[in-house]
Curated annotation (Swiss-Prot):
Quaternary structure and partners: Part of the 30S ribosomal subunit. Contacts proteins S5 and S12.
Protein name: Small ribosomal subunit protein uS8
GO MF term (any one): structural constituent of ribosome
Record field: transmembrane: none
Keyword presence, rRNA-binding: yes
Gene: rpsH
Amino acid sequence: MSTHDPISDLITRIRNAQMRNKSKVSTPGSRMRANVLEVLKSEGYIRGYASVEHSSGRSELEIELKYFDGEPVIREIERISRPGRRVYASVKNLPRVKNGLGISVLSTPKGIMADHEARDANVGGEVLFTVF
């Protein structure tokens, strides 16, 4: 199935799986989704992910979700920039999520990264979504 917004699809799959206390969830594979998952893994919001190749030639990403005391680690995950309304931020205007307790995930010229990494690299970009 084709999707017009793969990032929103990924976020929705993660949110729905955590509401049902699933340990794993799969999503169609792409390089952008893998880069987003790498940021979530490095920030400690998911346990990990793996690329699974099917005999038909398509790949899927299998995501291991993370829980703490039976509660999902990701409390809120919200899409900011959408295909119909892109949201960009310079390095000076990068949003802080819940006073720095959460992160914003950005697409920058240097790749997909968390907001604090973008501040360190002194780059702005498209604010994809926020996580708390």
